[in-house]
C-alpha cells in the first residue's frame, strides 16, 4: 500500500483529502503543523508527501528543503500562492509538483499517479505487513520504521527470503554470523526472541515460527 503524509494546517481540507485517499486505497498520515510534519517526514518511510506552504512553526519551503537534503521522497505542494515566482521557488526547493488551491480532487489524484510513476520501483519484501526495504536496509510496519540492529535485519531478511522453508540453527548461524564464527547456536534463539519482541507490539511476533528440534521459518 502507498503511504502518504499530508502536512496541511487547514484541518477540514486535510481530513477531506485523507478520506478521499483512503477510499482509493492509500494509507494516510496527517500533521497540521510544520515542525510535526518535518519530524514525521524524516522519521518514516513515506512514498509521497503532500505539503502546504503556509504552516505554523516551519513553512512548507523549509520543510521541502530539509526533506530533500535527506530523502528523495516525492513532494507535491498544495497552496493558495499562485504567483509564478512562488511556483518556481517551490519547484527549485525540491518539490516534484505544485498545485494551486482550490483544485479538483481528480486533478490531485492524477498528479499523484504521475509523480509515483516517475519513481523507481523499490525492492520491497512484504511478509504479512512487515515490509523490508532491501535498498534502504530498514523494516516498517504500517509506515512506521522499526529500530533494528544490522544483525536483527540480516536475520529477518534471511528468513523472509526463504519463506516457507525451515532453516536450521546452523544454517542461520553460518549465513548471519559467518562460517568462521565461534558463536554458539543458542545465539540464534536469543536474536529470534529480540525480533519477536520488536514485532509483538504490532501483533506480528507469531510471523516467525519455531520448528521444534530443527530451527525457524516464516510462513
Swiss-Prot record:
Keyword annotations of the record: Cytoplasm, DNA-binding, Phosphoprotein, Transcription, Transcription regulation, Two-component regulatory system
Ranges that cross the membrane: none
GO biological process, one term: regulation of DNA-templated transcription
DNA-binding residues (ranges): 122-219
4-aspartylphosphate PTM sites in chain numbering: 52
GO cellular component labels: cytosol; protein-DNA complex
Cell compartment(s), UniProt: Cytoplasm
UniProt-recorded Gene Ontology molecular function terms: phosphorelay response regulator activity; transcription cis-regulatory region binding
PTM characteristics: Phosphorylated by ArlS.
Domain of life: Bacteria
Residue ranges of domain Response regulatory in the record: 3-116
Entry function: Member of the two-component regulatory system ArlS/ArlR.
Name assigned to this protein: Response regulator ArlR
Lineage, broadest ranks: Bacteria, Bacillati, Bacillota, Bacilli, Bacillales
Amino acid at each position: 500500500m502507498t503511504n502518504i503524509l499530508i502536512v496541511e494546517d487547514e484541518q477540514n481540507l486535510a481530513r477531506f483529502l485523507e478520506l478521499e485517499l483512503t477510499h482509493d486505497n492509500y494509507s494516510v498520515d496527517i500533521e497540521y503543523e510544520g515542525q510535526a510534519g518535518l519530524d514525521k517526514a524524516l522519521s518514516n518511510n513515506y512514498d509521497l508527501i503532500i505539503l502546504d506552504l503556509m504552516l505554523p512553526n516551519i513553512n512548507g519551503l523549509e520543510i521541502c528543503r530539509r526533506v530533500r537534503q535527506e530523502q528523495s521522497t516525492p513532494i507535491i505542494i498544495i497552496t493558495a500562492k499562485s504567483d509564478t515566482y512562488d511556483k518556481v521557488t517551490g519547484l527549485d526547493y525540491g518539490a516534484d509538483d505544485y498545485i494551486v488551491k482550490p483544485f479538483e480532487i481528480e486533478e490531485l489524484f492524477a498528479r499523484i499517479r504521475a509523480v509515483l510513476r516517475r519513481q523507481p520501483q523499490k525492492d520491497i519484501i512484504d511478509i504479512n505487513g512487515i515490509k523490508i526495504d532491501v535498498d534502504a536496509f530498514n523494516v516498517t510496519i504500517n509506515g512506521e520504521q522499526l529500530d533494528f540492529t544490522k544483525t536483527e535485519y540480516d536475520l529477518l531478511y534471511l528468513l523472509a527470503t526463504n519463506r516457507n522453508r525451515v532453516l536450521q540453527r546452523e544454517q542461520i548461524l553460518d549465513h548471519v554470523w559467518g562460517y568462521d564464527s565461534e558463536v554458539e547456536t543458542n545465539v540464534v534463539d536469543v536474536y529470534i526472541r529480540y525480533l519477536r519482541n520488536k514485532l509483538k507490539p504490532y501483533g506480528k511476533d507469531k510471523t516467525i515460527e519455531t520448528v521444534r528440534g530443527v530451527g525457524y521459518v516464516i510462513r
